[in-house]
């Protein structure tokens, strides 16, 4: 049994392909999970889909052709050619998959290193897979350990100090383009997490925001949470507002562009459109008075951010390395601990049964029972010492040997019970 990760990110896949790979809604997520898990070699699986990445994390029986199967599943549902996806995909196995997962959770693999949005996105992907019964104890272990690793990095480094998300990078670029945002008004299209982040960063820089969303109630709720510097407008008036103001940020979950040349008419003032959605929201003709920036266009500011955080990132990567090693050490202990407990429990049961027989037959005086029980305990403890040491030193891939020991001693039931308890205790956050 092994961990495997198939990864498509801003590093290996451009935005045009990424938006085709997007599994943004529950129907698509459910469909890809069902298709991937129909392969019997794949025991557990989750899919993380954001504007900058699509990640498949799986716990599998066998590596042979499994990654190809996952890529074929993604190809089938996205319509992107298999060979193109295979060439682009980053595939990680065993400790490489865990190291990658920990790096993703800790925002070291993000477009903007140190942003904390990924933690919530990973939790959502995990909870969705769990609700769909596609995630079990092994992914529970991996995800919970990844979240703990991310927490350690946030507490021990400044990697997330003044956290920067893609939305805040867009606002930074807006400031570079027009200067002080104080007193300006920006149009924000959408009312989801990314739109909310854009609004918050704009308001932090003293701008006012007009929120436009198809669902007016969602827009109203967001505006109320932001205070007096936020207002709303009807989605039917979108064209009016994008032709009136210089700053437009769009972050909806639409399947196709909602701002096109039909809406965005030429104006006599400079406008800046920030498309922070995947798939893209904006498809207009650029000219001297209108500039459009998509997610991939934010990389220049991202590179500046990387330089500022490079030292902290190196510290964080060393923590990821240590936590990965610790994870596999704990996993090895988890493999051996249940069989050791089952053996000891079996020996204790046999000893207690024989002790009761001896008492019943009058072989022992009542005054000697406690001493006899202590003696028996010392005997089976001494007898099991060497097997215990050897079990703890078994290779981490020796699960078949452990299962055989349980079968030979007839302790499968106790072994399964202790396995379940061990995993449940380990998964407590």
UniProtKB/Swiss-Prot annotation:
Its EC number is 1.2.1.70. Keywords: NADP, Oxidoreductase, Porphyrin biosynthesis. Coiled coil: none annotated. SUPFAM superfamilies: Glutamyl tRNA-reductase catalytic, N-terminal domain, Glutamyl tRNA-reductase dimerization domain, NAD(P)-binding Rossmann-fold domains. It catalyses: (S)-4-amino-5-oxopentanoate + tRNA(Glu) + NADP(+) = L-glutamyl-tRNA(Glu) + NADPH + H(+). PROSITE patterns: GLUTR (PS00747). InterPro entries: 4pyrrol_synth_GluRdtase (IPR000343), 4pyrrol_synth_GluRdtase_dimer (IPR015896), 4pyrrol_synth_GluRdtase_N (IPR015895), GluRdtase_CS (IPR018214), GluRdtase_dimer_dom_sf (IPR036453), GluRdtase_N_sf (IPR036343), NAD(P)-bd_dom_sf (IPR036291), Shikm_DH/Glu-tRNA_Rdtase (IPR006151). NADP(+) binds at residues 190-195. Gene3D superfamilies: Glutamyl-tRNA reductase, N-terminal domain, NAD(P)-binding Rossmann-like Domain. One of its GO terms (biological process) is protoporphyrinogen IX biosynthetic process from glutamate. Transmembrane segments: none annotated. GO terms for molecular function: glutamyl-tRNA reductase activity; NADP binding. The active site is at 51 (nucleophile). It holds the Pfam family GlutR_dimer. The record marks 100 as: Important for activity. Homodimer. During catalysis, the active site Cys acts as a nucleophile attacking the alpha-carbonyl group of tRNA-bound glutamate with the formation of a thioester intermediate between enzyme and glutamate, and the concomitant release of tRNA(Glu). The thioester intermediate is finally reduced by direct hydride transfer from NADPH, to form the product GSA. Belongs to the glutamyl-tRNA reductase family. This is Glutamyl-tRNA reductase. The gene is hemA.
């Amino acid at each position: 049994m092994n961990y495997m990760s198939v990864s498509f990110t801003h590093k290996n896949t451009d935005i045009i392909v990424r938006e085709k790979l997007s599994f943004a809604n529950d129907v698509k997520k459910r469909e890809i999970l069902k298709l991937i898990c129909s392969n019997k070699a794949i025991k557990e699986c989750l899919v993380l889909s954001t504007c900058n990445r699509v990640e498949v994390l799986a716990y599998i029986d066998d590596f042979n052709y499994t990654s190809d199967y996952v890529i074929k599943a993604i190809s089938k549902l996205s319509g992107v050619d298999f060979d193109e996806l295979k060439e682009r995909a980053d595939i990680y196995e065993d400790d490489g998959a865990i190291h990658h997962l920990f790096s993703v959770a800790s925002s070291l693999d993000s477009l903007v290193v140190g942003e904390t949005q990924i933690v919530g996105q990973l939790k959502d992907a995990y909870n969705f897979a769990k609700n769909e019964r596609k995630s079990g104890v092994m992914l529970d272990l991996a995800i919970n350990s990844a979240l703990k690793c991310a927490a350690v990095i946030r507490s021990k480094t400044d990697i997330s100090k003044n956290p920067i998300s893609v939305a805040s990078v867009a606002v930074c670029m807006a400031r570079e383009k027009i200067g002080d945002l104080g007193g300006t008004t920006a149009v924000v299209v959408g009312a989801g997490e990314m739109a909310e982040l854009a609004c918050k960063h704009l308001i932090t820089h003293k701008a006012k925001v007009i929120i436009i969303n198809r669902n007016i109630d969602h827009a109203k709720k967001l505006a109320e949470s932001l205070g007096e510097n936020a207002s709303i407008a009807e989605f039917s008036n979108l064209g009016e507002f994008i032709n009136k103001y210089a700053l437009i940020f769009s972050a909806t979950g639409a399947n196709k562009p909602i701002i096109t040349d039909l809406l965005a008419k030429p104006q006599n003032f400079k406008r800046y459109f920030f498309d922070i959605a995947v798939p893209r929201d904006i498809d207009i003709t650029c000219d001297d008075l209108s500039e459009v920036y998509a997610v991939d266009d934010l990389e220049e500011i991202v590179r500046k951010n990387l330089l500022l955080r490079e030292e902290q990132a190196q510290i964080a990567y060393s923590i990821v390395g240590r936590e990965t090693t610790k994870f596999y050490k704990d996993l090895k202990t988890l493999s051996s601990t249940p069989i050791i407990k089952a053996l000891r429990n079996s020996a204790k049961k046999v000893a207690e049964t024989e002790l009761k027989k001896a008492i019943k037959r009058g072989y022992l005086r009542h005054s000697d029972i406690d001493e006899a029980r202590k003696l028996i305990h010392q005997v089976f403890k001494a007898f099991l010492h060497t097997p215990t040491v050897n079990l703890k030193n078994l290779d981490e891939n020796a699960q078949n040997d452990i299962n055989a020991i349980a079968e030979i001693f007839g302790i499968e039931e106790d072994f399964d019970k202790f396995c379940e308890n061990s995993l449940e205790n380990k998964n407590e956050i």
